[in-house]
Amino acid sequence: MDAEIPWPRSPLHRLAAAGTYFVTAGTYLKKPWFAERRRLEVLHRGLLKVADEFAWHLQAWAVFSNHYHFVAHSPESGAKSLPKMLGKLHGKTAVWVNKLDQTPGRKVWYNYRETILDHEGSYLARLNYVHQNAVHHGLVPVANQYPCCSARWFEKAATPAQVAMMYAVKTDRVNVIDDFDDKMRSEG
């Protein structure tokens, strides 16, 4: 076959339907631009703020030096606001971190991937995956010790039975591109 099939440079985003989504976004070249505590806290607060502003209801989140994950319910009107929401977060945090580093215009963010979660098993597995992600990356021994994720919040808001059930959900079959380990710490 002589016809070439164009290869997309970024993932196709299918965001028409309202629903629950799992989202992962990473920095350009997986650089740990947010490795310092203050930077990480700004990114963390920024995610919580834009989600609220765009009426996305976060269920779980984990924010790191070079990527983040979250599970959220979209607004009832649908998920089409996701690119604008993440564009605002990425734009503001990129300008801010570039100002700190005196590198105006440097590319900070790469792209994001989203998956609609339309089965309860997928939803529960990804919730637990996000709650436990700091443990997965070797940053803390227990998820609730990591300050920029939802595990501590979840453990306070849920009943002990809900916490036990959630943490018993297996995540070993969750298919997530999460190869950020070797780049997460500062390259100083």
Task: Go through each PLM region and give its residues.
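Short catalytic/metal-binding and nucleic-acid-binding patches
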Residues: M1-G188
